[in-house]
Each structure stands twice: as C-alpha cells, then as structure tokens.
Amino acid sequence: MAHPNEEIARSATEAISKGDMEGFLSFHTDDTVVHFPGRGPMAGDHRGKDGVAKMFQQQMQLLDAPPEIENHDIVAGDDHTVVLNKTRATRGGKMLEQNQVVVMHIEGGKIAEVWLHFSDQQAMDELASS
C-alpha cells in the first residue's frame, strides 16, 4: 500500500501539468514555501499561497502550455517525499526536456515546503529568460 504522502505528491504534480493552480494550491499549507533555484525570473523563495500562486501564474505566462511532467518514482515518508520526474517545458516553440528532483516537506497532509532541483539549471534559466 502506498504512503498517503505519495498520493499528495502525485496529485500536486498532476495539477501542475493540467495548469490547475487552485488544485495545486489545495495541496499546500497557507504558509507554504517553494524554493525555485537559479537566476531566471522565477528563481527565489515563494512564500505563502499568494507567493506560490504568483510563481504559478508567472510560469503559465512564460510557457506556451503547462509543463508536461512524467513521474518516474515517488519515495514517500512521514515527513518528506521525493519525486523523480522528467519535465518538458516549451517557450516560443523551444522545448526543454530534463530530469527533476522535487523534495517536499509534508505536514498534516499538506505540502509545507518544496525544493526544486533541475538536471540542467543553466538550460532552465535560459528558457525562462529568453
């Protein structure tokens, strides 16, 4: 039987792929924090549901469509869940495909903090900044 935090991570990831901001935010605590690495326009610590919503909206404005996320594995425990996936994002007709590691801290059935790690951070920064 899968750990309940695995389903939270899977559902949150599916919401991103559908461009469903409300669905995505429903899996987060009110004081959630998303750490987006790099030097691109989305880089930084996005705090609270309002901050994460702004990041999500910015992502939707930058990309031609919501990113396609293919989860390879989800390892869930009581406090942390790790998602290994392949992400495809397109901007201006240019597609970037790369592996991603997402670490989530989950409290009381909600995502409290997220750390994103891209296999090619420079390519991600270039896509977001082009």
For each of these PLM feature ranges, what is it?
Residues 1-30, 110, 125-130:
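Short, low-complexity N-terminal intrinsically disordered segments enriched in polar/charged residues
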Residues 25, 29-79:
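A solvent-exposed, acidic/Ser-Thr-rich amphipathic alpha-helical stretch
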Residues 45, 93-96, 122-128:
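A short, polar/proline- and glycine-enriched secondary-structure boundary/capping micro-motif
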Residues 64, 89-97:
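Short, cysteine-centered beta-strand-loop-beta hairpins and adjacent loop/turn segments enriched
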Residues 68-69, 96-102:
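Short, surface-exposed coil-to-beta transition loops
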Residues 77-87:
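A short hydrophobic beta-strand element
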Residues 87-89, 106:
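Hydrophobic beta-strand positions in extracellular immunoglobulin-like domains
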Residues 103-125:
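Short beta-strand edge/turn micro-motifs at domain boundaries
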